[in-house]
Amino acid sequence: MLTERQLMILKEIIRLFTESGQPVGSKKLMSELPMHVSSATIRNDMADLENVGLIEKTHSSSGRVPSMKGYRYYLDHLIQPAVLNPMDVATVQQSFGRHYHKIDEIVSQSANILSNLTSYTAITLGPEMAEIRLTGFRLVPLGNHQVMAIIVTSAGTVDNQVFTIPNAISGDELEKAIRVVNDHLIGLPLTVVSQKLKTEVPALLMQYMGSPGGFLNIFDDVLKQASQERLYVGGQSNLLNFSELTDVSQLKSIYNIINQSDDLAKLLELSPGEANSQVQVRLGDEMTNDLLKNYSLMTVNYDVGEHGQGLIALLGPTSMPHSRMIGLLDLFREELAKKLIDYYADFDDNQS
């Protein structure tokens, strides 16, 4: 069992290594500890910490650095969120002070704001889609058998795609199909709309068009675009600033992790109904990708009441100042949730 002094030494080694990136020796610790401890005593305590695997020696220095086990122990037992300085608080609050026109705009911009504040890679996910409803659907003729399909949702999002209409579908049939959508699907949650496309809607469309498959494909494609979980990334290139890899192909692979939605969702371990009210930290050897062994991933959920929950994540070096980042993420999720709740309230007022 570690003594209070050994725990204090471990915390100081992590703090000093985080600040300087240099191995920490007994002389440096002697000048930084809040009580007088001899260099010999510190060396003995460091030897004990090394024996249990919490710190380790580097080849190029007589000092010690935290091990992955040491970081995990620190994160599980010793860390306290840092009290943010007023400038950090003001910067976050001012960043959300501008007017936004869409939910997506707020969530995507928040990734850029957080990345700029931290110099790390930031990832944000909008509130869950379960309560978002279909509020509008239109087909705008573009000529040459092309139409633009437009879907509007209760989240304030507008999604559109251009499609080529099969020759077998007439303009009159399209108008009737749009009427079916407006009569039977408007106002329903997107998840319910998706289900009805496979069950009730085909039979309804068969009353008005000989082959509804073409129209169903159009509507289904643009609905999927509106329904997909949106992950936004800020500061993609920051990820490469902390890599110890020199192989170009491996560096490209790291960069691709955050540019491929499936890889990113897997990294974040997104799963329905799972929510973290506290900031969670995963270290490199705890992640699914070996290329990230020198990185640390911090995630936390934010709550937007009846509109669901979203997620904020930070991906940076294992040696990032976790205490400050936890404090910053706690503040950031509060401000993001406030902004989204205000947006939803304004949107509801405008709809009534």
Curated annotation (Swiss-Prot):
GO molecular function: DNA binding
GO biological process: negative regulation of DNA-templated transcription
Signal peptide annotation: none
Keywords: Repressor, Stress response, Transcription, Transcription regulation
Record carries keyword Ligase: no
PANTHER family on file: HEAT-INDUCIBLE TRANSCRIPTION REPRESSOR HRCA (PTHR34824:SF1)
Function: Negative regulator of class I heat shock genes (grpE-dnaK-dnaJ and groELS operons). Prevents heat-shock induction of these operons.
Family membership: Belongs to the HrcA family.
Protein name according to UniProt: Heat-inducible transcription repressor HrcA
Organism (species): Latilactobacillus sakei
